[in-house]
């Protein structure tokens, strides 16, 4: 909010990291560079590669139906999270990942990042910050001569982990599954042949300078990436300008403008459909891989066009990967514009008033045309898809700030008002069908012509066009005050009231929430000696609302392309109340031995109430669902960090920091009438189910039938018998969220050399791999090959034929569920996340003109893991889908060089 305070006066936990933490070893999505560097911060990258989004979580999942992502604040102003929703998490496959705001930020523009993990810390930002806030401060011009900084970060990427395949048994008679006879020679490893060495370069040039009355900052950055998947490219460009004026002695004006553009081609998409990895991993062993690579299409005289060439072109989840990359290529183009400004008037030395405004616009075009014969024969004449997404946000606020001291007393106060106006829109163009012969018989004139004019009736009779606009407004008033005594005791009070248009048709469209906090610097009240620099206790209590989605409180009718108005199937939620998170936090901060040792410890407990649920409506209402407010999700845990800096001599120093967090989640209440709990995510034979007394992320899996002695039971064919996939027949397999996360950073300086590394990990949680289940079901896994060599699979003393076992317990068809109990793994893992070795060439190009060169590496190796995939990568950023592997793009090990030049 533009409010500045000394860290030692804060009554809540807040951690600030420098810009070097995200730009020394860069990630294309800069938030991923913070993995393992802060207690209580969990970052899960999506499995879509460059330009993809990431799930960010502070202190556990709180909202069942709403968002759990924190607010992103840039230079004090809340920002839009993304252009549109990110990739839909489904085992069938999500076609797009719209990215997030973090992927549009140039890490070289960042001066610092402050992590506000608790509700008390972010209460002034209102409902949008119910899950905490990430405050990013960007660089600005400094008075003095113009300074130029140039940086270039170049890395090469290779897959960190690949599945293990058998190379002994080939295809059966259908040319699909690898349950055939032994091969005369070992099969090629198609995955090793398919993936290439990726290449990414990230470059920035910036200029800053000015005088006392005018300061300016300008930067240009770009990213060029050729992914590990063939034909995958990503590029982005960023422009950033900030200027500050001193108009009068007491009037200050600043203006900023930013523009970013992103282009991605063949971005990875987890799931079965639209994913080249299904063909790479499932291709029958022993085929001529190079033949299908060079001849991925053949001419079909009946359709008059080239069609897919593959061992079996009828299966939708199984295609030639090179056809997918060249003939059903997803292309995404994104633009983001941002303009902002502020004016501040220092009325007196103690009193000022400021006004700020920022406008943001996001645009995306997503093109995913599929040539004839794509996805089996689902699109016999091809499919056209051209979607456009738009979002706008206008934010403004006015704040009055007062700061004064009287002898031992001090008062800092802020009061203000803000408004946020958000609009979204999307226009979808989609067409597919059969070859046109006459009116009423077919609708596509020519295959693979992706224009509306190629469709009979210009798509109007297909009903495939779609358009939607939304608008939301949020107005607020707020105030905060801090009273200080002897610069040692601090009391914070804050309050905010929001008016949300999403609640317009309810009894009350506003909601109020307060917070209170206190901190005591005991070292300033009681003599503790020179070795104690800070000895601080703090505590806070807050209530923060979480706004609700639009159009829940009013019936919404839909106008179809044909002119027909369709009635809603959900009852309006006229008694809707926003979620509210009640949070308590206590902690200790200390620094000792001339600030060489620092220690921080925090305990927190949150209860998020008034959750909103969709439940079945009474039959006589004629509606399908209705909404209710209910539920209480509790999170409580501990965060701790300890750091030490040792200066051994003028040339040699060592700095180390260790952080660890523990979070325990508990569902205290749910809506009545849910006998089998609430399912928030499901896959083939696996469900994430919430139950009272359980935890957010509880995983239930399908199991095989066993006798009273616990031994597997066979059917007449000698196959294991699957139990049902209703929750009451499923098996609890654990919780998908780790309770403990940690990170350990070390930095050594010797003269002009710098060496650093980061080890991080987590303990607990579960990972579900549909990839491994499918490899087993198709007979291509190393595990299935070993079993066939042995001639049997032995499970708890019962022998099975390998094919009978794996085609039943594994996945041989993505429409069928399987025994997921055998494909759940421990999420515990410890890895060497980052490492860097650099040298600074001082005064290389003149006095003060230095060059720093560093060898950098990321995701080098695991010290320990149980899962066959990277446990920290997920197929989506939605609720309940972390830790799921459905042919996800492998994580990358990157090695490279980082250069920085200043003059």
Where are these regions (language model features)?
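Short, small/polar-rich motifs associated with maturation and membrane association
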Residues: 1-240, 245-260, 338, 345, ...
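Conserved small-residue
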Residues: 149-184, 427-439, 628, 645-736, ...
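Flexible loop and strand-edge segments within Gram-negative outer membrane beta-barrel domains
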Residues: 154, 158-161, 183-190, 200-221, ...
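Surface-exposed loop/turn segments flanking beta-strands in extracellular/periplasmic regions
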Residues: 167-186, 273-323, 368-382, 425-464, ...
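Extracytoplasmic gating/loop element in the C-terminal half of outer-membrane beta-barrel translocons
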Residues: 191, 466, 500, 762-852, ...
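Outer-membrane beta-barrel transmembrane strands
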Residues: 196-212, 220-224, 235, 321-368, ...
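Small-side-chain secondary-structure face that scaffolds active or pore-lining regions
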Residues: 227-238, 246, 258-272, 328-436, ...
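Outer-membrane beta-barrel signature, preferentially recognizing the C-terminal barrel domain
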Residues: 326-328, 456-476, 558-600, 626-649, ...
């Amino acid at each position: 909010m533009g409010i500045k305070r000394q860290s030692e006066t804060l009554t809540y936990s807040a951690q600030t990291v420098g810009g070097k933490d995200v730009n020394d070893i860069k990630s294309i999505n800069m938030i991923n560079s913070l993995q393992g560097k802060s207690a209580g911060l969990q970052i899960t990258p999506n499995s879509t590669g460059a330009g993809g989004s990431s799930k960010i979580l502070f202190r556990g999942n709180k909202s069942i139906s709403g968002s759990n992502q924190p607010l992103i604040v840039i230079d004090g102003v809340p920002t839009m999270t993304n252009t549109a929703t990110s990739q839909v998490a489904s085992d069938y496959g999500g076609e797009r990942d719209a990215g997030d705001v973090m992927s549009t930020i140039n890490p070289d523009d960042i001066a610092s990042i402050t992590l506000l993990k608790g509700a008390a810390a972010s209460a002034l930002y209102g409902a949008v910050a119910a899950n905490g806030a990430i405050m990013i401060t960007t660089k600005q011009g400094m008075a003095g001569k113009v300074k130029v900084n140039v940086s270039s970060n170049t890395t090469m990427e290779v897959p960190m982990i690949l599945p293990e395949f058998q190379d002994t048994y080939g295809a059966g008679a259908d040319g699909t599954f690898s349950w055939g006879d032994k091969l005369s020679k070992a099969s090629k490893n198609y995955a090793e042949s398919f993936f290439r060495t990726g290449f990414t370069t990230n470059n920035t040039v910036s200029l800053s300078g000015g005088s006392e009355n005018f300061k300016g900052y300008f930067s240009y950055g770009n990213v060029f990436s050729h992914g590990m998947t063939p034909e995958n490219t990503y590029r982005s460009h960023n422009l950033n300008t900030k200027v500050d004026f001193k108009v009068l002695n007491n009037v200050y004006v600043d203006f900023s403008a930013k523009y970013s553009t992103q282009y991605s081609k063949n971005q990875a998409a987890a799931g079965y459909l639209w994913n080249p990895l299904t063909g790479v991993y499932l291709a029958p062993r022993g085929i001529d891989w190079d033949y299908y690579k060079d001849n991925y299409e053949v001419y079909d005289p009946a359709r008059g066009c080239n069609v897919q060439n593959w061992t079996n072109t009828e299966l939708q989840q199984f295609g030639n990967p090179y056809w997918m990359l060249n003939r059903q290529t997803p292309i995404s183009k994104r633009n983001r514009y941002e303009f902002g400004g502020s004016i501040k008037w220092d009325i007196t030395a103690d009193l000022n008033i400021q006004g700020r405004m920022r406008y943001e616009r996001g645009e995306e075009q997503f093109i995913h045309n599929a040539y004839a014969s794509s996805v089996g024969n689902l699109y016999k004449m091809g499919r056209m898809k051209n979607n456009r997404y738009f979002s706008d946000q206008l934010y403004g606020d006015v704040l009055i700030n007062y700061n004064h001291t009287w002898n031992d007393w001090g008062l800092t106060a802020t009061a203000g008002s803000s408004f946020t106006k958000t609009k979204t829109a999307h226009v979808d163009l989609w067409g597919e069908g059969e070859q046109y012969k006459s009116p009423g018989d077919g609708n596509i004139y020519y295959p693979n012509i992706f224009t509306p004019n190629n469709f009979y009736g210009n798509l109007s009779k297909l009903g495939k066009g779609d358009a939607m606009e939304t608008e939301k407004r949020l107005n607020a008033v707020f105030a905060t005050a801090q009273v200080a005594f002897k610069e040692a005791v601090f009391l914070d009070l804050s309050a905010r009231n929001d008016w949300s248009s999403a609640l317009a048709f309810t009894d009350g469209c506003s909601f109020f929430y307060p917070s209170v906090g206190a901190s005591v610097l005991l070292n300033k009240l009681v003599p503790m000696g020179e070795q104690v620099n800070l000895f601080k206790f703090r505590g806070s209590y807050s209530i923060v609302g979480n706004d609700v989605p639009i159009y829940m409180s009013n019936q919404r009718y839909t106008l179809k392309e044909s002119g027909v108005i369709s009635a809603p199937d959900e009852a309006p939620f006229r008694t809707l109340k926003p979620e509210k998170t009640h949070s308590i936090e206590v902690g200790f901060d200390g620094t000792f031995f001339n600030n060489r040792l620092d220690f921080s410890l925090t305990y927190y407990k949150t209860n998020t109430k008034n959750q909103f649920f969709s439940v079945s409506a009474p039959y006589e209402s004629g509606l399908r669902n209705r909404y209710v407010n209910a539920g209480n999700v509790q999170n409580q845990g501990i965060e701790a960090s300890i750091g030490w800096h040792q200066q051994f001599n003028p040339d040699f120093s060592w700095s180390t920091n260790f952080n660890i967090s523990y979070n325990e989640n508990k569902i205290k209440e749910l809506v009545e009438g849910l006998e089998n709990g609430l399912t928030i995510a499901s896959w083939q034979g696996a469900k994430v189910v919430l139950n009272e007394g359980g935890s957010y992320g509880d995983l239930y899996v399908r199991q095989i039938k066993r006798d009273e002695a616990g031994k597997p039971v066979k059917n007449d064919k000698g196959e294991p018998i699957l139990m049902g996939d209703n929750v009451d027949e499923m098996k609890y397999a654990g919780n998908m969220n780790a309770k403990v996360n940690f990170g350990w950073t070390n930095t050594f300086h010797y003269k002009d050399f710098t060496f650093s590394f980061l080890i991080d990990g987590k303990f607990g949680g579960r990972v579900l791999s549909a990839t491994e289940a499918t490899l087993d079901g198709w007979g291509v896994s190393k595990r299935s090959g070993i079993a066939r060599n042995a001639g049997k699979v032995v499970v708890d003393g019962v022998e099975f034929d390998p094919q009978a076992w794996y085609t039943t317990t594994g996945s041989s068809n993505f429409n069928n569920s399987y025994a997921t109990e055998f494909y759940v793994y421990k999420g515990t893992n410890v890895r060497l996340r980052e490492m860097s070795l650099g040298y600074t060439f001082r005064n290389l190009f003149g006095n003060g003109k230095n060059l720093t060169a560093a060898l950098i590496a990321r995701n080098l190796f695991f010290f320990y893991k149980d899962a066959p995939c990277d446990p920290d990568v997920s197929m989506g950023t939605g609720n309940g889908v972390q830790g799921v592997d459905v042919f996800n793009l492998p994580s990358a090990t990157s090695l490279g060089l980082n250069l920085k030049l200043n003059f």
